[in-house]
C-alpha cells in the first residue's frame, strides 16, 4: 500500500496550483471597482493593501458578514462588527483590507488603528459609517499607519480604481499571506425570470494557520439587489456549508471574516426572504462559497491531497457535520491519507468519538464507509465498511489507485435518516510540520 | 529562535527513555501474582499475553474500570463491561490481556472470542464471572484463538506465576505495541493510622494511536481493602485527572480501558466513601495514575518534548480542563513546540476557540501565559502574556533555553477563579507523520 517518497514527491510536483486554480479571465458584477497597492507593510514589496468600492448609486447597497467566534477577536473584527451593526447592514460601500499585519492582540491602540483605516476610506468616498476593515498577517504587532495611510492615498489617487480582470486579480493577490496562489472566483447566474447576475469572490488562507498568519478572509460581491436581512441569512447559511466546513489543521483564528456586499446595480426587484427567488439565490451563493472555500483547502499548507468527506443519510444535518468534521480534523486520518493508506479503522474511530447531539444519529450496525474515485475510473466506489462490517478483503490494487489521486472522496452513509453534510480537508504532511515548526523564526 | 535540525536530532538522542523511565526494582502489593508468555499472536515472537491474578482469600476483592466512550467499542471492552456490571464490582480475581490483535470491529465472532478468553481463565481459577479481558493491537482481525488458548495453558502450566520484579516487568512488556519502553510504576503509601499499602500500575500506549494500535490500556492493583463503589469513585476521579488529560494526537480509541483491583490483603478496615481515609487514598491514587499516564505521553510517537499544560485560577475545573485540552491538542501549538518557537499567539488562539461551558471562565483582559523551565534554571518563568497584553520584548535567549528543554511547562492563569486543571502533551514532529503515514503498510 505504501507509495515510495519519490512517487509522492512526483505526484506533488505534477500539480501546478496556480495554473489549475487561478482564472485567466472573467466578468465582474456591475457597479464595483477595486484598487490595490504595495504599501510597504509587507517587507518584500508585494501587494498588501486593497479596496473594494461600490459605485452604484441607483439604490442603497446591503452588507452581511460572519465573524470568527474565537474569544480573542482582532481589532478589525471588532470594529467592522460595530460598523455593520450600526449600519444595520445597509449602505456599506467600501471594504479596505491589508495583509502583512493582522492588527490582532494589539489592545486599544489597535482598535484606534482599525478605526483610522475606516475613517480614511470614509473620507475618500465622502460617506459616514460605510467602510469595513479587515487585516491579516502577523499578530501582536501594530499596523504601520503611515504606510497604510500613504497606501490608501495612492489607491484613491495615482493608482486609480479598475473593474477589469487584472484589477480584481491584483486585489486577490493583495490579501494573500502564505497562500501559494490568489483565490478569485467569478460566475454568472440566471434566475427563472431571465435576470442574470454575477457573484465575484476572493479569499485568502492556506491553513487555519492561526493566528500568526491570521487566517481566513473571504469576500463575495454581487450586483443583485438583496434585502439586508435576507443577505445575512443567505451568507450565514452558505458559510455554515462552505467556509465552516473546511479543515486544514482545525485551528480557528482571531481574524476570520467572511463578508458579502449586494449593490443592486441590476434593475430587478429586491430579493427578500419572501421572494420566490430567495431559496434559489441562497443555494447559488452557497455553491459559490463552497468553490471559494475549497480553494483554501487546495492551498492547505504542505498538502498533497484534496479530500471531500461526504456524510449522508444522517438523522440530523448538525450531527452529519460533526462527524464530517471529526474525520476531517483527525491527525490519524490525515496522516493515513498522506501515506496513501486505506485505513478505514482510523475513519471509524474518528466517527466513534465525534460528540453527537443525538446518539441516535449513529448506529454502528448501519454504517457504510467507502473511498470514491473522482477521475471517472472504475469501479468508482471502494467499499471499506458495509453495514458496520469491515470488508476484510479489500482490492488493494484499486485502493492504491484511488489513494494515489490528488482528489478523492471519503463517503460515510449513516443510514439513520436523509440529511447530508460535506467537509473538505487535506492531508497532513512532513511539509506541514516544517512550515509550522519554523514559521515565526 | 530556530534550532538547527542537527541540534534537534541530538537533543532527541540524548534521551534514553528506557533507562530513564523503566524501574530496575520494586516491591509489589501482597496477594497478586502475574504470568506472561509469547503466544505467537505477535509475529516477532515477543511477549504478547499476560495474566494478573489475585490469590488473596482473606476477603473478597473489588474492581472498578473506566472504558472508552468511543461508539465503536471493541469486543473485550463490551465483554469486560458486562462482567463488571454482573459482578457489581466484586470478586474479580483475574485480568487477561493480549497484544498484537485488538479484537475490535470483529462482530459477533469477536464477542465470542473475548468470552472464550474469559472462560478459559475462569476455568483455570475455578471461579465464575471473575475475569476481565483486554486486547490491543491491529483492528479488524480476529484473534488466533488456538494460540491464545495454548498461551493461557502455558501461563497456568509450565511458565508459572510470579510476584517478583521481573514477572511484573514482563507483564508490562507483554501489553506493549508501538511502545518504546514498558510502563510499570510501583509505590508504597502510608495512611495516618500507620497502615502502609502498595499501588502497582502498568500501562501501554504511545499515542492515542487509535484504532490500529488500539490504544490506551492501564491497570492499577492495590492490597488495600476498598469497597467497590468507593473504588469506582476513586478511579473515575483519578482517570478524569490523569489518563483523560493526556494528548498525543487527540484521537480516542475503540479499546481504551483503565481498570483497578483492590484485594484487601492488608489487614485493615475496608475503606468506603465515608471513611476518614477516603479522600487521602483518592488523591494518592490520582497522583499515581498521573505518573502512569505521563509515561504514555513521554513515549508519544515521534515526540521530542514532554509538556505540562497548567491552567490555573479558573472559574470551573471543567473549563480549565477544556482550555488545557484545546492547547494540548492544537496542531499549531504542537508544531511550534517541536520547532522550539515561543509562539504565544498560537496558545492564545487555542484558548480562544475552546468550547467553554461558561463564557465567564475566560476574560481576555485577565489572562496570563508563561513558559516555565523545569530544570531549576533561572528565571524559572518567562512571561508571554500578562493581563491580556502580549509581552512584545521577550528575552529570546531565555526563550530558546527553555524551549530547548525536553521537559517544560505552559502556564495559563485565567484569573477568574480558584480552580485548576493539568494536561500533559507532546510535540508534533516529522517522525510522527512518518510513523502514522506508513503504519498499516
Curated annotation (Swiss-Prot), chains A, B:
It comes from the Eukaryota. The active site is at 215 (nucleophile). Its EC number is 2.3.1.35, 2.3.1.1. The record marks 214-215 as: Cleavage. It is an enzyme of class 2 (transferase). One of its GO terms (biological process) is L-arginine biosynthetic process. Keywords: Acyltransferase, Amino-acid biosynthesis, Arginine biosynthesis, Autocatalytic cleavage, Mitochondrion, Multifunctional enzyme, Transferase, Transit peptide. This is Arginine biosynthesis bifunctional protein ArgJ, mitochondrial. It catalyses: N(2)-acetyl-L-ornithine + L-glutamate = N-acetyl-L-glutamate + L-ornithine; L-glutamate + acetyl-CoA = N-acetyl-L-glutamate + CoA + H(+). The gene is ARG7. Its main location: mitochondrion. Pathway: Amino-acid biosynthesis; L-arginine biosynthesis; L-ornithine and N-acetyl-L-glutamate from L-glutamate and N(2)-acetyl-L-ornithine (cyclic): step 1/1; Amino-acid biosynthesis; L-arginine biosynthesis; N(2)-acetyl-L-ornithine from L-glutamate: step 1/4. Heterodimer of an alpha and a beta chain. Catalyzes two activities which are involved in the cyclic version of arginine biosynthesis: the synthesis of acetylglutamate from glutamate and acetyl-CoA, and of ornithine by transacetylation between acetylornithine and glutamate. It comes from Saccharomyces cerevisiae (strain ATCC 204508 / S288c). Belongs to the ArgJ family. SUPFAM superfamilies: DmpA/ArgJ-like (SSF56266). The keyword Acyltransferase applies. The keyword Flavoprotein does not apply. Pfam families: ArgJ. GO terms for cellular component: mitochondrial matrix; mitochondrion. Changing residue 215 to A: Blocks autocatalytic processing of the precursor protein. Inhibited by ornithine. One of its GO terms (molecular function) is glutamate N-acetyltransferase activity. PANTHER family: ARGININE BIOSYNTHESIS BIFUNCTIONAL PROTEIN ARGJ, ARGININE BIOSYNTHESIS BIFUNCTIONAL PROTEIN ARGJ, MITOCHONDRIAL. It is found in: Mitochondrion matrix. Residues 1-8 form a transit peptide.
Amino acid at each position: 500500500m505504501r507509495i515510495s517518497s519519490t512517487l509522492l514527491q512526483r505526484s506533488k510536483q505534477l500539480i501546478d496550483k496556480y495554473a489549475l486554480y487561478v482564472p485567466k479571465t472573467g466578468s465582474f458584477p456591475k457597479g464595483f471597482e477595486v484598487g490595490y497597492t504595495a504599501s510597504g507593510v509587507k517587507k518584500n514589496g508585494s501587494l498588501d493593501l486593497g479596496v473594494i468600492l461600490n459605485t452604484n448609486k441607483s439604490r442603497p447597497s446591503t452588507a452581511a458578514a460572519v465573524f470568527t467566534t474565537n474569544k480573542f477577536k482582532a481589532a478589525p473584527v471588532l470594529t467592522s462588527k460595530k460598523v455593520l451593526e450600526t449600519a444595520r447592514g445597509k449602505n456599506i460601500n467600501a471594504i479596505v483590507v491589508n495583509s502583512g499585519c493582522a492588527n490582532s492582540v494589539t489592545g486599544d491602540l489597535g482598535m484606534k488603528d482599525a478605526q483610522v483605516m475606516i475613517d480614511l476610506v470614509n473620507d475618500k468616498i465622502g460617506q459616514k459609517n460605510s467602510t469595513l476593515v479587515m487585516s491579516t498577517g502577523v499578530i501582536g504587532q501594530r499596523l504601520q499607519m503611515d504606510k497604510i495611510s500613504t497606501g490608501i492615498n495612492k489607491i484613491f489617487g495615482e493608482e486609480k480604481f479598475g473593474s477589469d480582470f487584472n484589477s480584481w486579480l491584483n486585489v486577490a493577490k493583495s490579501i494573500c499571506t502564505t497562500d501559494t496562489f490568489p483565490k478569485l472566483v467569478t460566475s454568472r447566474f440566471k434566475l427563472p425570470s431571465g435576470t442574470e447576475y454575477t457573484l465575484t469572490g476572493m479569499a485568502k488562507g492556506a491553513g487555519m494557520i492561526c493566528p500568526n498568519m491570521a487566517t481566513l478572509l473571504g469576500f463575495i460581491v454581487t450586483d443583485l439587489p438583496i434585502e439586508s436581512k435576507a443577505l445575512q441569512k443567505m451568507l450565514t447559511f452558505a458559510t455554515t456549508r462552505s467556509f465552516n466546513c473546511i479543515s486544514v489543521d482545525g485551528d480557528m483564528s482571531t481574524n476570520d471574516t467572511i463578508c458579502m456586499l449586494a449593490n443592486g446595480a441590476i434593475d430587478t426587484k429586491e430579493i427578500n426572504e419572501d421572494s420566490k427567488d430567495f431559496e434559489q439565490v441562497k443555494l447559488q451563493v452557497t455553491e459559490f462559497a463552497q468553490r471559494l472555500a475549497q480553494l483554501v483547502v487546495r492551498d492547505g499548507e504542505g498538502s498533497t491531497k484534496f479530500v471531500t468527506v461526504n456524510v449522508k443519510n444522517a438523522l440530523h444535518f448538525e450531527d452529519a457535520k460533526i462527524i464530517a468534521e471529526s474525520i476531517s480534523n483527525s491527525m490519524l486520518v490525515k496522516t493515513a491519507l498522506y501515506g496513501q493508506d486505506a485505513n478505514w479503522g482510523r475513519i471509524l474511530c474518528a466517527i466513534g468519538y465525534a460528540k453527537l447531539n443525538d446518539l441516535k444519529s449513529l448506529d454502528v450496525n448501519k454504517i457504510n464507509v467507502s473511498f470514491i474515485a473522482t477521475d471517472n475510473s472504475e469501479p468508482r466506489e471502494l467499499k471499506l465498511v458495509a453495514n458496520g462490517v469491515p470488508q476484510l478483503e479489500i482490492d488493494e490494487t484499486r485502493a492504491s489507485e484511488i489513494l494515489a489521486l490528488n482528489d478523492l472522496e471519503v463517503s460515510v452513509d449513516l443510514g439513520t435518516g436523509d440529511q447530508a453534510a460535506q467537509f473538505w480537508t487535506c492531508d497532513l504532511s512532513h511539509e506541514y510540520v516544517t512550515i509550522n515548526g519554523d514559521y515565526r523564526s
